[in-house]
């Protein structure tokens, strides 16, 4: 049987395992766990810490947003198939599990004293902390987009929320016969199939509503990095003449005023330019002192999701240095949350994290 250690450390393959039961839960566990980030990883960890401890562990979730907006399926909003309200939920479900939810920003973390400083609501002491801050963008790689004014014109919409709606409006306002271009950074990045999905859905929108319009995919990678067969078949069978895919097209910068993508050997002017910048772990991970690979992604012990160099600090989701074949996805963040919850409960009980399958 493939055990959890072998799976997480060796394969990391999504879709071949379900981490379902309480492998590490223990009613002997006590203490206070602070979870920062209420996305798929953090919210899952908070819930299962309460569930698997039978309520004996105190859990506080710190999340700046008052509602959760799902990044997975947000492309449906961009394509006009759903509204932002359709993919938005409250945090009341976590409160029902006994999770204390605080809406605030983290401004500092002292991992030696095990204290987290909030912008408005003082400090939180913790026995163990979970960071699940998602991604931040490497704006220095796209110099023209370093300022907020430029970012409001050339959108990423890779964090679901206002930019999701704004990108939809840009597409609606674009004249029929215009061109939408999507730039994709070199992997790894959040949600490997997501850009190709977005391009395909916008191609469908154009085909049905703006048939003279075009989709141009400028991919820094040498080929489609996820689900290639499915996407290429769709582009050939359904969107031939509507969608053009260009590999090895790495973005160097942007001419914001003229909506132009500046590539190494070309400049591409379009009507709607959608730039996905290179990405790294959320800034809080670096601020915590956690070891980063290539100054980008957190190195962790996959058995416990604990930082390799900061004890008591567990890091989840897109911020981690992914194992081979493990995508940065909501599904995997959910699994990370369960693995971390089980391991933390073992550790708070004075036990080692379980190596048994979950």
Regions found by a protein language model. Give the residues of each.
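Glycine-rich dinucleotide-binding loop and its adjacent helix/turn
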Residues: 133-209
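Beta1-alpha1 glycine-rich phosphate/pyrophosphate-binding loop at the start
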Residues: 25-100, 186-227
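N-terminal secretory signal peptides and thylakoid transit peptides that target proteins
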Residues: 1-14, 19
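Glycine-rich, N-terminal phosphate-binding loop of Rossmann-like dinucleotide-binding domains
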Residues: 11, 133-134, 277-278
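FAD-site-proximal beta/loop scaffold in flavoenzymes
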Residues: 147-174, 269-272, 276-334, 346
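Internal hydrophobic alpha-helix adjacent to the cofactor/substrate pocket in enzyme cavities
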Residues: 333-357
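A Rossmann-like FAD-binding core segment of flavoenzymes
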Residues: 96-109, 113-116, 124, 204-296, ...
